[in-house]
């Protein structure tokens, strides 16, 4: 890592620790603890609310929203959509982790709906997930990609 990048990274870390942003995660139960701990280590404050009745209120008090499709269910999809609308109304970033969209039509249709409605700011996906979101043939095994990150970034960059 170059000294310039290290310096910029240090400034970003300092800014996050100074602000202590609240990050609302609607994530999967497999990684919820890891996501909360990483958020804390970065100097931010995690909240892991996924009940549809409270997500708009929680999101309206957050500084960013993370949506992870890892363990998707209809109730969670409803909560994610409500939270994403609240985030858009507040003007905060929404990060979508489209886990397994190449393996499940339910996940793909839902992720595309969020994207097409302008409810996502950043997509954090692997090669196969990015190709699936571009409605291209995506090869993967389960939720894992057979491609590489560089190819995925190249594919996404061509659409912008």
Model-identified regions with their sequence ranges:
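Conserved N-terminal subdomain of the carbohydrate kinase-like
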Residues: 2-96
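Conserved small/polar residues in nucleotide/adenosyl-binding loops
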Residues: 159-160
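Conserved beta-alpha-beta core of the PfkB/ribokinase-like small-molecule kinase fold
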Residues: 64-156
